[in-house]
């Protein structure tokens, strides 16, 4: 966050009243969304309403001890983030203050009114130019490359709001982010650092239809409810159903180039877990530490409410910057409900007319404004990049009919409904296969056919049909018991049980099972389908269900998930199933 210096202060006003994070000031010459510094301590705030001589400000810090009569200083600039090398492997708060830098200055408990630039202004980076003198460049073009971390090459771009022109001077070597590395004949100078307002989407040429899946390594997601690179997904669920673990799994194993993890109003311990785990884990694609492709934005539940509102925008702006370089970015927002609650609190302080359940009337507009910044895009420099947004939703009491869940459902195309009953039964990830859906299936099917197996969509549909049939039979089973069913339906229930227990269940804390590649996901499902086909043949030949499920090879289906050398194991298992079941008749 760029710090306002004395020369940047354009006007001063006076505080008239303070109500929690909302402060009103008089005699302040300001525009909407200007950043202001409030009170003697210079607390950062943002103008959210102007009425006559009264300016309303939401303050991004605790406002206790702020009194009427204290000054308010206007910077005349909108809330912006610093974009440049150094953002990977870093942790920020909701307004892009680097928490690790501030901790070194003042320990674990931060004082109010402190600030630090989002990017280290003194560190030097190796700049390798990609343009020469005399080259024509336009907004969005790559002018140089900086090795930012072991796994990420940071591309220095012509800022989107520049005119562009002919390169008149270009430097090579080590520079700080504020030193000029390229000069243009238009008089414009390009540094490695640029600023961008968080509420304004960065421009692109066009939005494209996503056709590649974001492979997560979670069988239930990749197999049944896939999300595309550039897609949007919501993970609603009651407390303790596994939202955060699912988000962590996606942040760890999703095949995105960059991960931006926004902890928005959730527990601090969960962010601590991310900070401790990620540096030790390897990226399956590069073998480098996961942290080297991750940017964390921590705005935990005990941090000021107003900053929750900005942290989501800070995260998506950083994601857009890396998308402009041609990277596939995954953004996790945990949890959008806390963001909506922050909006509700600010709205009620402003005495606005409440909408449903006290949320502001513009809740749907704000949610869609955020999710619509996701997508697969053609960038201004001709490259393609994507942002996939996965938002957790925490409906009180697990009630999916509340406004945040319902408005999110209208916007996203992928719905992963977490179920408290499944979580209580220790079925994880506890994604309810009857309530969840993905609208990306059809547009991703060609990719699965080409890259995994041409019959993948058909095998998946078979699994869905079996699970649907099980759901219909469960009502009868609860009334009369399983033994009263015809034998073919009893066998269907057994097959469905293996789909649930051997395929859908996955252990996030097992070294092998935590990540399941698409090929293994398919092979495991075909093994269960093979058991289904052979078992029904045995049943048709007059073999009782009890004998079929007592065959030694059948329980081996539950061990497929933990096999590293899975191809050999599954091939052998299919052979054993065939031999042992055919011996029965």
Swiss-Prot record:
Keyword Nucleotide-binding applies: yes
Function: Component of the A-type ATP synthase that produces ATP from ADP in the presence of a proton gradient across the membrane. The A chain is the catalytic subunit.
Record-level GO BP terms: proton motive force-driven plasma membrane ATP synthesis
This protein's UniProt keywords: ATP synthesis, ATP-binding, Cell membrane, Hydrogen ion transport, Ion transport, Membrane, Nucleotide-binding, Translocase, Transport
GO molecular function: ATP binding; proton-transporting ATP synthase activity, rotational mechanism; proton-transporting ATPase activity, rotational mechanism
Top-level enzyme category: translocase
Subunit architecture: Has multiple subunits with at least A(3), B(3), C, D, E, F, H, I and proteolipid K(x).
Entry's Gene Ontology cellular component terms: plasma membrane; proton-transporting two-sector ATPase complex, catalytic domain
NCBIfam families from the UniProt entry: ATP_syn_A_arch (TIGR01043), PRK04192.1 (NF003220)
Catalytic reaction annotation: ATP + H2O + 4 H(+)(in) = ADP + phosphate + 5 H(+)(out)
Family of this protein: Belongs to the ATPase alpha/beta chains family.
Sites where the protein binds ATP: 237-244
Main subcellular location: membrane
Enzyme Commission numbers on file: 7.1.2.2
Subcellular location: Cell membrane
Organism, as annotated: Natronomonas pharaonis (strain ATCC 35678 / DSM 2160 / CIP 103997 / JCM 8858 / NBRC 14720 / NCIMB 2260 / Gabara) (Halobacterium pharaonis)
Membrane topology classification: Peripheral membrane protein
Name of the protein in question: A-type ATP synthase subunit A
